[in-house]
C-alpha cells in the first residue's frame, strides 16, 4: 500500500530547516528581530508589487462589508490593514516584529487610520477577540505546525478565513535542487503543502490564483551571485559539497540577458479561502 504523505510533518520539517539556519545567523550577529534593518525595504517591495492590480485584493474587498471586522495575521508594515480599514468597522493587526510594527504605526499616522488596532505577538499565541474575517498573507511560513495555525484562525473567525501563499512551479529551479537534495520538490513551505494540510484537516477550501500570472523574474549579476542566493534559500550557506550540481543547474535554467542572469518566472500567489467551521 502506498504511504500517505503527512503534509503537516513535511511543512514542519521545512520550517525547522529554515529556523535552524536563522538561529545560526542570529548567533553570528543578526539579532532576534530579523526585520530590524529591513522593514522599510520590505515595505517598498510590497508597494512596488501593489502598483499592479490583482484579483486577490479585488476579491477580498468584494467579500467584506462596512459593519464587519478583520484580523490581519502577520500584518508586517500594514499593507493589508490599510487596504481593509476604510471598508470595515475595524482591523486588528497582529505581528511579532517591533521593527515591522514601528513602520506600521508610521503608516497608520500618515493615513489617519484610526480603526486599526495593533497587537504585538506571534500567532496563534496572542489574545484577540473573534473577528468576522481573518487574513494571513505570506506570514505563515515560519510557523512549524500549520494545522495549529489554521485551527487558531478558525477559532477567531466568524465568517471567512483567507490565506495568501506562494505557489511555485514544481519544476522550478528550487524544486529541481530540492529533488536532488531532499528527494522531493519542496524547497520551502508553500501553497501545495498548505492545501494538502487543509484537505487532511477536512477543509476543502476554494482557491483563486492571481490573475497577474507569475511574479517578476529575479535577476543576479553573476552566476556566483545566483549560486549564493540559491544556497541561501536552500539553507546551504557555508556548505560547498553541492556547488557543482547547483552551478550546473543554474547554467541550464538561467538565461543571460543584457549582462545579467535572469531566473525563470516560476512563482505566483494563490488565495485560499473557506468558511470557518466555528
Residue ranges of predicted features:
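A short glycine-rich, Lys/Arg-flanked "PGG" loop and its adjoining helix->strand segment in the class I
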Residues: 147-162
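Conserved class I S-adenosyl-L-methionine
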Residues: 1-64, 160-187
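A short SAM/SAH-binding and catalytic strip from SAM-dependent methyltransferases
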Residues: 132-145
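Conserved Class I S-adenosyl-L-methionine
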Residues: 206-278
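Class I SAM-dependent methyltransferase SAM/SAH-binding core
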Residues: 71, 77-124
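Short alpha-helix
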Residues: 187-202, 206
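Short conserved loop adjoining the S-adenosyl-L-methionine
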Residues: 125-129
